[in-house]
Amino acid sequence: MLTDLFYSTFGCLYSPTSTMDVMGTARRKTVVRLNVYDMYWLNDYASNIGVGIFHSGIEVFGVEYAYGGHPYQFSGVFENSPQDAEELGETFKFKESIVVGETERSTSDIRKLIKSLGEDFRGDRYHLISRNCNHFSAVLARELTGKDIPGWINRLANLSGSIPFLEKCIPQEWLTPIVLQASVDEKKRGSVDSAEEATEKLVVRSLNDSRTTILDNRTANGAIIMSASSSNSDRICMSPSSSSSASSCDTLDYDDLIVQTPSTFSSEKKSRSNSPPIFRIWNTIKATINGTQQTAPTGAATVIPASSASNIGKTNSTPGTTSNGLAKPTCSEC
């Protein structure tokens, strides 16, 4: 009586499409299907010897997972729309869908499983006889449901000794469905783009390191400091001198950059003449004659005392000349 009451009350929780986990909540089961495709015109010849050549994939949660070959060392497992032969190619024709069983795995669990199987079912390890799409379908179906797929799906592998030439007769595009080839091309483009981006970053970093090294070597004996950056122009900072504690900065272009060292400054000083400019000589002469204060362009003043100015024009030892060696003006010149 109590048992009947229990099942009448809670029997819905024990339906074929759900189970109970340890927490007492229902876990929904999902149907797992095996979709079979016929390589139709090749089977016209293979059927004469009692062997069919089929492609298969496992459908779960509205996605079909299958395996194909390519020459690269990464996964050959791919996804496609269930029962869509056009995504596979012209040589594929949908044949039938077979329910293998049910699974309690979630979508995230299945994706982890697919990724794990992809490490074993690599594209470059594909073999038409010993490691083909049907072998992958059998492994995935067993992992999800604990059941095997029908034996006739992969009969070709069991009779491979009878037709050793068959693999060479099948075109390569049959081993690599269109949807798998598109996935491979996309992954290759992504790898190339990543490699190019990494190379560009490496070149830029190398250039920046070179600029910094060169400028550090110049700064050891020079008067400027540069902060390296990735742009064409950088911050140029003048090192503070002994008389000034502040440093001035400016933004200059690399093409216009001229680094001056102390040796350059000293060579510039040596190249300059120590003799005063002509206008300073003329101002000195005028100040000497007039006995007035004259301000030089540099701000220094020259003062001629009046006592000294009174002696201007007196002869020294040579007639016709003044004490400073200048000729006396004649009457006509006056």
Curated annotation (Swiss-Prot):
Knockout-associated phenotype: Worms lacking both POST and ubql-1 have a shorter lifespan and display an accumulation of ubiquitinated proteins in the nucleus.
Purpose of the protein: Protease which deconjugates SUMO from some substrate proteins. Has isopeptidase but not SUMO-processing activity. Collaborates with ubql-1 in the export of ubiquitinated proteins from the nucleus to the cytoplasm.
Localization per Swiss-Prot or TrEMBL: Cytoplasm; Nucleus
Bias (Polar residues): 310-325
Organism field: Caenorhabditis elegans
Annotated segments matching region Disordered: 310-334
Segments forming domain PPPDE: 30-174
InterPro entries in the record: PPPDE_dom, PPPDE_sf
Catalytic-site annotation from UniProt: H55, C133
EC number: 3.4.-.-
Any one Gene Ontology cellular component term annotated for this protein: cytoplasm
Classification of source organism: Eukaryota, Metazoa, Ecdysozoa, Nematoda, Chromadorea
Predominant localisation class: cytoplasm
Protein name in UniProt: Desumoylating isopeptidase 1 homolog
Single GO MF descriptor: deubiquitinase activity
Any single GO BP term: proteolysis
Keyword check for Nucleotide-binding: no
Tissue specificity annotation: Expressed in the pharynx, hypodermis, intestine, head neuron and tail neuron.
PROSITE patterns membership: PPPDE
Alphabetical keyword list: Cytoplasm, Hydrolase, Nucleus, Protease
Family matches, as Pfam families: Peptidase_C97
Family statement drawn from the similarity comment of this UniProt entry: Belongs to the DeSI family.
